[in-house]
Swiss-Prot record:
<dbReference type="GO" id="GO:0003735">
    <property type="term" value="F:structural constituent of ribosome"/>
</dbReference>
<dbReference type="GO" id="GO:0006412">
    <property type="term" value="P:translation"/>
</dbReference>
<dbReference type="InterPro" id="IPR023803">
    <property type="entry name" value="Ribosomal_bS16_dom_sf"/>
</dbReference>
<keyword id="KW-0687">Ribonucleoprotein</keyword>
<dbReference type="GO" id="GO:0005737">
    <property type="term" value="C:cytoplasm"/>
</dbReference>
<protein>
    <recommendedName>
        <fullName>Small ribosomal subunit protein bS16</fullName>
    </recommendedName>
</protein>
<dbReference type="GO" id="GO:0015935">
    <property type="term" value="C:small ribosomal subunit"/>
</dbReference>
<dbReference type="InterPro" id="IPR000307">
    <property type="entry name" value="Ribosomal_bS16"/>
</dbReference>
<comment type="similarity">
    <text>Belongs to the bacterial ribosomal protein bS16 family.</text>
</comment>
<dbReference type="Pfam" id="PF00886">
    <property type="entry name" value="Ribosomal_S16"/>
</dbReference>
<keyword id="KW-0689">Ribosomal protein</keyword>
Amino acid sequence: MVKIRLARYGTKKRPFYKLVVADSRFSRNGRFIERLGYFNPIAKGKSEILKLNLERIEHWTNQGAQMSERTKKLIKQKR
């Protein structure tokens, strides 16, 4: 099954997440099909906290991709 989910990057205690489309059998930070945006929960100054490609997200959901709960909340927040 294809899922839209967050992959964790960054360093210890300074997380940075990429929103990716990946097969559910792959590990969290493993192979992915496409990168759809990012989420930086500790952004400072003029840095963007959330950037999403809503057009591609719509494309993947129409193709049958399932979203994680956190991803659903972030997309709802962006719209």
